[in-house]
Amino acid sequence: MTNIRKAHPLAKIINSSFIDLPAPSNISAWWNFGSLLGVCLILQILTGLFLAMHYTPDTTTAFSSVTHICRDVNYGWIIRYMHANGASMFFICLFLHVGRGLYYGSYMFPETWNIGIILLFTTMATAFMGYVLPWGQMSFWGATVITNLLSAVPYIGTDLVEWIWGGFSVDKATLTRFFAFHFILPFIILALAAIHLLFLHETGSNNPSGIPSDSDKIPFHPYYTIKDILGALSLALVLMMLVLFSPDLLGDPDNYTPANPLSTPPHIKPEWYFLFAYAILRSIPNKLGGVLALILSILILAIIPLLHTSKQRGMMFRPLSQCLFWLLVADLLTLTWIGGQPVEHPFITIGQLASILYFMLLLVLMPIASIIENNLLKW
């Protein structure tokens, strides 16, 4: 008799995706982040659902409803901080997942890669709208500044901003719609993640060597299920240390002050995971130019497959490209630091240099390094 997991229509899908899936025998811990992102997403949806049961999306009560969750709701404080810090863990996993894709040439699966970019954009939009909901000072001013960037769009800019606001400033209508979008988008992310996996399973996983692994596959369960559980437990450990020991480490103290349209905070800055893009935005003196650079800083990922000049897939055996990759990582860390600094000398210059280097590395230096490596190997 055929095993039920192979015969039942629903079990068959789960079986072919998580149990009998043939996986390369040599994938490292860098391949754990896909499943960790799934864990993060489920955690965010569950904690978010419980928060939404007590939150009120109204300018007069939003801030106090969050206070009420933390003070009066049973275990409300831990749900709130797991949701806030869960977002940070989500982005850490996202950046490492994308970094792994860049390093090992996973972008050579174009459908999987492009859906991944759409997922990244959607997640960033969701996180931005979630940050507005507590209606603190940084929520309000962050929403005002970031939505205002759309006014840089020629001709229709102002109308576009007022359409998104639902009025002439960030107000009740803005908060209500942001809450609606913040609630629905994670489910769209869930659907996109399923499509992401669907395309990945069409080709099979890449592996650190970049060499086709069809001749050496092992079943996903138990080898990688146990590895994923270890990863999830490690993630849970880091998250709970953050939540229980320093829940406000990654937040902004200004957000503990209720939103006040009459008082601007001295330094308006987004959450830490947007700082690199914010630094690129600020490094260009022109408004429209800054907005374009901001969008391109993420959208540049879409043309990475076109810039692949190497005869090898990954960077495992390419020391020159490895040096440039880690320079890119250092550059992104520099941009993240600059994004959180005030707009004054020497930070302006450092930000501009780091922004130029970011685009130079991806568009010029890395493709050239690949060509040099090909020639050195006489390929």
From Swiss-Prot:
Gene Ontology molecular function: any one: metal ion binding
Cofactor(s) for this UniProt protein: heme b
Topological category with respect to the lipid bilayer: Multi-pass membrane protein
Database matches in Gene3D superfamilies: Cytochrome Bc1 Complex, Chain C
Cellular component annotations (GO), alphabetically ordered: mitochondrial inner membrane; respiratory chain complex III
Binding locations of a ubiquinone: 201
Main location: mitochondrion
Keywords: Electron transport, Heme, Iron, Membrane, Metal-binding, Mitochondrion, Mitochondrion inner membrane, Respiratory chain, Transmembrane, Transmembrane helix, Transport, Ubiquinone
One family name in Pfam for this protein: Cytochrome_B
InterPro entries given in the database record: Cyt_b/b6_C, Cyt_b/b6_C_sf, Cyt_b/b6_N, Cytb/b6-like_sf, Cytochrome_b, Cytochrome_b_C_euk/bac, Cytochrome_b_N_euk/bac, Di-haem_cyt_TM
Binding of heme b b566, residues: 97, 196
Co-factor: note: Binds 2 heme b groups non-covalently.
Coiled-coil zones: none
Subcellular locations according to the entry: Mitochondrion inner membrane
CDD domains linked to this entry: cytochrome_b_C, Cytochrome_b_N
Superkingdom: Eukaryota
PROSITE patterns tied to this protein: CYTB_CTER (PS51003), CYTB_NTER (PS51002)
Transmembrane region(s): 33-53, 77-98, 113-133, 178-198, 226-246, 288-308, 320-340, 347-367
Family note: Belongs to the cytochrome b family.
Role according to the record: Component of the ubiquinol-cytochrome c reductase complex (complex III or cytochrome b-c1 complex) that is part of the mitochondrial respiratory chain. The b-c1 complex mediates electron transfer from ubiquinol to cytochrome c. Contributes to the generation of a proton gradient across the mitochondrial membrane that is then used for ATP synthesis.
Other comment: Heme 1 (or BL or b562) is low-potential and absorbs at about 562 nm, and heme 2 (or BH or b566) is high-potential and absorbs at about 566 nm.
The name this protein goes by in its record: Cytochrome b
Organism per entry: Aonyx capensis (African clawless otter)
GN (gene name): MT-CYB
